Amino acid sequence: MKLFVTGGYGFIGSNFINLASNMGHTVMNIDSVTYAANRDNITMRPNIKNVEIDIVDYNLLEKTMLDFQPDAIIHFAAESHVDNSIENPYVFLNTNIFGTYNLLQASSKLDNNFHYIHISTDEVFGELGEEGFFTEETSYDPKSPYSASKASSDHLVRAWTNTYNFPATIVNCCNNYGPNQHKEKLIPKIITNCFLGNDIPIYGKGENVRDWIFVEDFCKAILLIVQNKSIALNESFCIGANEELTNIDLTKKICEIINNRFSLEHNCLDLIKHVDDRLGHDFRYAIDASKIKNELGWKPENTFEKGILKTIEHYKENL
């Protein structure tokens, strides 16, 4: 298949391209190469082409897409750091909302029978209490500029589907972790600071709960959706691995693994420092992934313990 991928130099996009290209798919990657991108994230193969354009540049986006004539469009490109969205929301609105609009408009001009896969987040649903899970039926209740921008883009896709019979699938996923993630994010920051001996900042008491999935497992779920258009078309899927951890337990677990596996001059647990909580910090996210498991036969292959060891090794080699 011919796959048109946005944000392929980023964390999840690069892992997806490496997986899909290795399986023989032809990939066109477009990326604006922001600070969070890294060209070295992609293992270059003859069936990958990279074009450095911004999805807010409609004319270039349209020309590139129409020249390529993809079978599927997988939209990963997004501004995603919640803290940055609080400081500078405009960038998030521009990329996540208007960039998505441009993709919808450009892909609507394709000649072939394409499939648009919109990658979103569980943060659009707001927060959970101590019980319950997000599902495909959960109402939207975004709490940050980031999640509001992603919720808006989800609604745009649904509007295009309902109004123009646009062939789309929406994916809402829990927190990904694994190789190629920018070091500003929580797990890379914990691992990197452990090896460097730097403080590990934890918001508030660290009691906020997140559901974690190893990025390779998520990418395999996306590829299943691409390969099963007849089932996935005009549907939404919530994807998670049922690996819930409080931020403080996550941090301690990683610190203890590194303490036990590597001879460092310091105890990583001593690096943990509690800082003022983030504005609008949602308490808990957790996903019920029954739909994709039942309809497409997907299941995660990596436990958190297995995935985090691979992740630690990656960041140790790329300090």
Model feature map: region roles:
Residues N22, C194-L319:
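C-terminal substrate-binding subdomain of Rossmann-fold SDR/epimerase-dehydratase oxidoreductases
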Residues M44, I53, D57, E130, ...:
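Residue-level signature of the cytosolic catalytic core of signaling kinases
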Residues P142-S149, P179, K183-I187, D211-V215:
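The catalytic Tyr-centered alpha-helix of NAD(P)H-dependent dehydrogenases
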Residues M1-N176:
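N-terminal Rossmann-like NAD(P)+-binding domain of SDR-like oxidoreductases, especially those catalyzing
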Residues N59, D71, D83, Y90, ...:
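Residues in well-ordered alpha-helical elements
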Residues S152, L156, W160, I190, ...:
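Hydrophobic alpha-helix immediately C-terminal to the catalytic Tyr-X-X-X-Lys motif of short-chain
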Residues N38-I42, L128-E131, Q181-E184, L250-K252, ...:
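Short aromatic-enriched loop/helix-cap "lid" or pocket-rim segments at secondary-structure transitions
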